[in-house]
Swiss-Prot record:
One of its GO terms (biological process) is negative regulation of DNA-templated transcription. CDD domains: AlaRS_core (cd00673). The gene is alaS. This is Alanine--tRNA ligase. It comes from Neisseria meningitidis serogroup C (strain 053442). It is found in: Cytoplasm.
Length: 874
C-alpha cells in the first residue's frame, strides 16, 4: 500500500464514522506564539479543547503537517542516523470534542488497523498499553476487543511523579489532561527490542503506531483532577511509521515516498544509491521540511523560524558537499517532492517556483563560503586533539555562515567534542564589539579625498559600481581578504547611509570572484557613503567592478517604519498640541522609536487616538511623493521642519496626501497602505519634558496583536473567567485573597518563630552579667523583631542578636533587656554586626534592626559578638 493511499484510507475511514475531514493547518501556528512550529495534530484544535473556540462539528479527522526542529521538540541532530527521526512528518488524527470517548476511540482504531476492509494487520502483531489506573480502557481492550491480557501493558507513573507517565498526557501544568492508550506493532523476533515497560523497550522491535489520548480531567492549581463535563479524544497515528508497517519494512526511509526522494538525491548529488548512507537520508528528509516551511511563508533569516529553516538548508547542503556535490543541487529536488506530495498538499505545486527560488538563493549564498569554511575546519581537525577550539567554531559561524549545530554534526562524525564555553566567550566578545560599534561608524573620520558617492537608493535597489576605497582597522588599504572586517566606498550606491534617525542599509557587494557582506552603511563625509561589514569570500580590490545589492526585506521594513513615523509625528501634534517637537528618533526594521517634547505622560486615550489617525491614513492608501525644491518653496508647502536642524539650499519634501508634509531624506513606502498596520507598544519618560514612544508596523504589528490576544485567552483560562470583562474582577479578587493569605501566613510564621525563640533563650551563653544569644534562624524581618522583643521581655539580662537570610539579603535584629541598656545598647550591637556583613542600621537602646548584603560573612560575625559584648561589660 502506497503512502498516499494510506493517507486517503485513514481520512475516508473516519469520514464514514461521521468525522469532518479538516485540512492541515499551517506549519506556522499563527494563533499560538508559544509554539515555534506546528508539531502535533491537536495544535489547530487547542482552543477547542480549552473551550475558547467552537466548531460546527464534534468529530474531526486530519492529515497534519508537522515540523520538529528547534525549540523544545528538536529532532535535527538525529535525522538521517535513525530509522524514524524526521524534521518533517505527517500525523494522522481523529478527534472528538465532547462526542465519543474511550470505547469508540479504541474500537475505531482497532477496526481501521485489523479489518480486512481497511488495513488488515494481523491482530497478533499488535499490543496495547494503558495507564496503570485506567481500568476502563484496560477492560475495553480485554473484554470488548478481545486482546489477550499478556498483550495489554499497564504503564504507571514512570517519570518520577504522580500523573507523570508515558501513558498520561497533559497540555500544561494545569488544564485538560488524561490517560492515554498506545498501540504498538511487532516488527518481528529478528529485530532487537522488548515490549513497553521492559528494559529493552528502546529497541526497534515494538514500535508505537497510534496514541489515543483521553482528555477526561481538568487539573487545577492544587493538582486536583476534576472530571471534565464533556471528555474529549485526541489521537495520533504517524503516517510514515504506519507506511513502514504496511510496506513490510523496518525503516521509514524504506517506504515508497522516501525511496523516490532518496533516488532523486542520489541523482542530483551524483552519489551511489545506498540505504546505508546517512547523507542521502538527511537530504531527503530536509527537502520536505524546507519546502513545506517556505510554502507556509517562512523564509531563511538570522532569527526565529527563519533561522531554523536556514540551519536545515545549510545542513542539507553540507551533506551534499560530503557526497561530492559542490554545485547548487538542493532546489532541484522540489519537483520530485511535488510529484510525491503535491496531490495531498496543493500548496507545494502552487508555490513550487517560489520554493525553488528561495532554496537556490540560500544554497548559492552558503556555497560561496562552504568550501573555504570546510577547508578551515579540516585543517583544524587535522591537528588532532579531542576537542574543536571555540575560536574556530565561532569563525565558522561568523565568517562562513556555519550554524553551531552544523559544526557539531561534522564533529560528531569524527568523534570530536566541541569547546562550547570557548564559542560562548567569542559570541560575548562579538556582542561587546557590537555595543562599541559607534567607534567604527560615521564618526570614525576615515581618511578619504576621492570623488563623492552618488546615491541611487531612492529608485534602485541594485547598482553596478566601482570600488573607490577600502578600509581595514580604520586605515585605507588596497584590498580586503576573506575574513577581513572593513569598509567599502563605491561610486554608485543603492545603500542608504544612517541619517535622520533611519539606520543604514545592509546587503551585499559582490562579483563572480568575491563577496562583501554589508552590515551597516554610514556617512564618512557629507556626500561619501561607507559600507561597513565583512569580506566573506574572495579578495576585493580598489578599482574592482562590483554589484551592490540592498537586502530588500530589511529595506522594506525600514521604509514602513519610517513612513509610519511621519504619520505619527503629525498625529501627535494634532492630538497633543502644537508644542510637540521631535527630540530624536530611531527607525529600524523592527520598530520606530520617537522622542517628543511633552510635559506629561501620554494617556491611553490619546495613544488610541494617535493610532486611529495613523491607521486611517494607512487605510486611505494615498501616494507618498518626494520632491526636491528650494527651502523657500518648501516653507510655502507648510512642511514640518526640525527646530535647530541645518538644511541646505535645496531640500527634499515628502508628502503623504493631506496627512503629512515633512522634510526628509530617508527612504519611504510608495503608498501609505504599504505600512499595513500601525501599533504603539510603549510610552514613557526619558528626561524632564521628553517622552519616548515606540511603535511597530506591518507583520510585526500583527504578530504583536496575536500575542496579546493569546495572552488574554491564557489569562481567561488561568483565572477561569467567563468573558474578557470578568478577568479584571477575577484578578482583583485573587490579589485580595492572596494578600489576606499572606497576612495570615506572616502571623503564623511569627507565632511559630516566637515558640522557637524560647529554646534559644534556654541555650543562651551565660557571661555572668549577661546572657548572650547570637544565632541565625529562618524568619523574615518582621518575625525577627517579634522574637527579639519576646526574648528580651522574658529576661532581665539578655543580649540578643538574631540573623536571617531572605532572597540573598541579610536581616539583623538586636535586643537588650532594659536593665542592661546602661552598659550595652542594641543600636551599637546591630551597627557592629551590620558592618561585617556589608550593611548598616540602628535603633533604640533596647531594640535595633539592620540589613546586609554579604551572607557569607554571617558565621564569622556571629562568633565575634561574644568578644564585643565582653568588652562592653568589662
Amino acid at each position: 500500500m502506497k503512502t498516499s493511499e494510506l493517507r486517503q484510507k485513514f481520512l475516508k475511514f473516519f469520514e464514514t464514522k461521521g468525522h469532518t475531514v479538516v485540512r492541515s493547518s499551517s506549519l506556522v501556528p499563527h494563533d499560538d506564539p508559544t509554539l515555534l512550529f506546528t508539531n502535533a495534530g491537536m495544535n489547530q484544535f487547542k482552543d477547542v479543547f480549552l473551550g475558547f473556540d467552537k466548531r460546527p462539528y464534534s468529530r474531526a479527522t486530519t492529515a497534519q503537517k508537522c515540523v520538529r526542529a528547534g525549540g523544545k521538540h528538536n529532532d535535527l541532530e538525529n535525522v538521517g542516523y535513525t530509522a524514524r527521526h524526521h524534521t518533517f512528518f505527517e500525523m494522522m488524527g481523529n478527534f472528538s470534542f465532547g462526542d465519543y470517548f474511550k470505547r469508540d476511540a479504541i474500537h475505531f482504531a482497532w477496526e481501521f488497523l485489523t479489518s480486512p476492509e481497511w488495513l488488515n494487520i494481523p491482530k497478533d502483531k499488535l499490543l496495547a498499553t494503558v495507564y496503570a489506573e485506567d481500568d476502563e480502557a484496560y477492560n475495553i481492550w480485554l473484554n470488548e476487543i478481545g486482546m489477550p491480557s499478556e498483550r495489554i501493558v499497564r504503564i504507571g507513573d514512570n517519570k518520577g511523579a504522580k500523573y507523570v507517565s508515558d501513558n498520561f498526557w497533559q497540555m500544561g501544568d494545569t488544564g485538560p489532561c488524561g490517560p492515554c492508550s498506545e498501540i504498538f506493532y511487532d516488527h518481528g523476533e529478528e529485530i532487537w527490542g522488548g515490549i513497553p515497560g521492559s528494559p529493552e523497550e528502546d529497541g526497534d522491535r515494538w514500535i508505537e503506531i497510534w496514541n489515543c489520548v483521553f482528555m477526561q480531567f481538568n487539573r487545577d492549581e492544587q493538582g486536583n483532577m476534576n472530571p471534565l463535563p464533556k471528555p474529549s479524544v485526541d489521537t495520533g497515528m504517524g503516517l510514515e511509521r504506519m507506511a513502514a508497517v504496511m510496506q513490510h519494512v523496518h525503516s521509514n526511509y524504506e517506504i515508497d515516498l522516501f525511496q523516490d526522494l532518496l533516488k532523486a538525491v542520489a541523482r542530483e548529488t551524483g552519489a551511489a544509491f545506498s540505504m546505508d548512507e546517512p547523507s542521502l537520508k538527511v537530504i531527503a528528509d530536509h527537502i520536505r521540511s524546507c519546502s513545506f516551511l517556505i510554502a507556509d511563508g517562512v523564509l531563511p533569516s538570522n532569527e526565529g523560524r527563519g533561522y531554523v529553516l536556514r540551519r536545515i538548508i545549510r545542513r542539507a547542503v553540507r551533506h551534499g558537499y560530503k557526497l561530492g556535490q559542490s554545485k547548487p543541487f538542493f532546489h532541484k529536488l522540489v519537483a520530485d517532492l511535488v510529484k510525491e506530495m503535491g496531490g495531498a498538499y496543493p500548496e507545494l505545486k502552487e508555490k513550487q517556483a517560489q520554493i525553488e527560488e528561495a532554496l537556490k538563493n540560500e544554497e548559492s549564498r552558503f556555497a560561496q563560503t562552504l568550501e573555504t569554511g570546510m577547508a578551515l575546519l579540516e585543517n583544524a581537525l587535522a591537528k588532532g586533539g579531542k576537542t574543536l577550539d571555540g575560536e574556530i567554531i565561532f569563525k565558522l559561524y561568523d565568517t562562513y555562515g556555519f550554524p553551531y549545530d552544523l559544526t557539531a554534526d561534522i564533529c560528531r562524525e569524527r568523534n570530536i567534542e566541541l569547546d562550547e564555553a570557548g564559542f560562548e566567550r567569542e559570541m560575548e566578545a562579538q556582542r561587546a564589539r557590537a555595543r562599541a560599534a559607534q567607534s567604527f561608524k560615521a564618526n570614525a573620520q576615515l581618511p578619504y579625498d576621492g570623488q563623492d558617492t552618488e546615491f541611487k537608493g531612492y529608485s534602485e535597489r541594485q547598482t553596478e559600481s566601482k570600488v573607490l576605497a577600502l578600509y581595514k582597522d580604520g586605515e585605507q588599504v588596497n584590498e580586503l581578504n576573506e575574513g577581513d572586517s572593513g569598509a567599502v566606498v563605491i561610486d554608485f550606491t543603492p545603500f542608504y547611509a544612517e541619517s535622520g534617525g533611519q539606520v543604514g542599509d545592509v546587503g551585499y557587494i559582490f562579483s563572480s570572484e568575491n563577496r562583501f557582506e554589508v552590515r551597516d552603511t554610514q556617512k564618512i563625509k557629507a556626500a561619501v557613503f561607507g559600507q561597513f561589514g565583512v569580506q566573506t569570500s574572495g579578495r576585493l580590490k580598489v578599482g574592482d567592478s562590483v554589484t551592490a545589492k540592498v537586502d530588500d526585506e530589511i529595506r522594506n521594513a525600514n521604509m514602513r517604519n519610517h513612513s509610519a513615523t511621519h504619520l505619527m509625528h503629525k498625529a501627535l501634534r494634532d492630538v497633543l498640541g502644537g508644542h510637540v517637537e521631535q527630540k530624536g528618533s530611531l527607525v529600524t526594521a523592527e520598530s520606530t522609536r520617537f522622542d517628543i517634547s511633552h510635559p506629561q505622560a501620554v494617556t491611553a486615550e490619546e495613544i488610541a487616538e494617535v493610532e486611529r489617525r495613523v491607521n486611517e491614513a494607512v487605510l486611505a492608501n494615498v501616494a507618498v511623493n518626494a520632491a526636491i525644491m528650494s527651502m523657500e518653496d518648501a516653507q510655502k508647502t507648510g512642511a514640518m521642519m526640525l527646530f535647530g536642524e541645518k538644511y541646505g539650499e535645496e531640500v527634499r519634501v515628502l508628502q503623504m496626501g493631506g496627512f503629512s508634509t515633512e522634510l526628509c531624506g530617508g527612504t519611504h513606502v510608495s503608498r501609505t497602505g504599504d505600512i499595513g498596520l500601525f501599533k504603539i507598544i510603549s510610552e514613557g519618560g526619558i528626561a524632564a519634558g521628553v517622552r519616548r514612544i515606540e511603535a511597530i508596523t506591518g507583520l510585526n504589528a500583527l504578530k504583536w496583536a496575536q500575542e496579546q490576544e493569546r495572552l488574554v485567552k491564557d489569562i481567561i483560562a488561568e483565572t477561569k473567567a467567563q468573558t474578557e470583562k470578568d478577568v479584571l474582577a477575577k484578578i482583583q479578587a485573587g490579589a485580595a485573597h492572596a494578600k489576606a493569605l499572606e497576612k495570615e501566613l506572616a502571623k503564623a510564621k511569627a507565632e511559630l518563630a516566637v515558640h522557637a525563640g524560647a529554646k534559644l533563650l534556654d541555650d543562651a551563653k551565660d557571661l555572668g552579667a549577661a546572657k548572650l544569644v547570637a544565632a541565625q534562624i529562618e524568619a523574615d524581618a518582621a518575625a525577627l523583631r517579634e522574637i527579639v522583643t519576646d526574648l528580651t521581655g522574658k529576661s532581665d539580662n539578655a543580649v540578643i542578636l538574631l540573623a536571617a537570610v531572605n532572597d540573598g539579603k541579610v536581616s539583623l535584629c538586636a535586643g537588650v533587656s532594659k536593665p542592661l541598656t546602661g552598659k550595652v545598647k542594641a543600636g551599637d550591637l546591630v551597627k557592629f554586626a551590620a558592618e561585617q556583613v556589608g550593611g548598616k542600621g540602628g535603633g533604640r537602646p533596647d531594640l535595633a534592626q539592620a540589613g546586609g548584603t554579604d551572607a557569607g560573612k554571617l558565621p564569622e560575625m556571629l562568633v565575634s559578638v561574644e568578644s564585643w559584648l565582653c568588652q562592653k561589660l568589662s
